[in-house]
Amino acid sequence: MNILITGGTGLIGKALVKSLSGEHRLTVVTRDITKAKETLDSLSQNSPVSFIDSIDAIDDMARFHAIVNLAGEPIADKRWTTSQKKRICNSRWDTTAQLVAKINSASSPPLVFLSGSAIGVYGDKGSQAVSEETPPHSEFTHELCAKWEAIANTVDGHNTRVCTL
């Protein structure tokens, strides 16, 4: 399969690239291609990873069988100031909206779009077990994840299956 990955240099993305690179052709969207190559080339198994620096560089999503969207400003690296919250949100929402637009306009869209989310959709429940039926708690992480998932789910589902992680 030919797979497009955003957020490929993050914690989950690096593990995913390592796992998939032996059997699939991977293209990673990254802001810093040089740094991404340094990080990921040693992880990829017998299969070189391709890199692009912008979703806009993709003419048509038809070449991809799947898209894995893990992009986003790290959530735990800095204090959640108003400006940091904005970066956290926009880095996820804007990237996802760009991908959705590309998928929906593709001549032959990918079969699946996997888009990140987080346990944060449920908020701080302490030791309480949560499931998909657990009602969300209104706080920053819930609002972040709820909108992120809502944007991902605007993909035309007739052609592309959407999975939020």
Located regions from the model:
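Conserved Rossmann-fold NAD(P)-dependent oxidoreductase catalytic core, especially the SDR/UDP-sugar
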Residues: 96-139
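Conserved beta-loop-beta element that borders a ligand/cofactor-binding pocket
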Residues: 117, 150-165
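Flexible cofactor-recognition loop at the NAD(P)H-binding site
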Residues: 10, 72-73, 119
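N-terminal Rossmann-fold cofactor-binding loop
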Residues: 29-34
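NAD(P)H-binding glycine-rich loop region in Rossmannoid oxidoreductase-like domains
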Residues: 44-98
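N-terminal Rossmann NAD(P)H-binding glycine-rich loop of SDR-like oxidoreductase domains
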Residues: 3-23
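Short-chain dehydrogenase/reductase
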Residues: 86-93, 130, 134-149
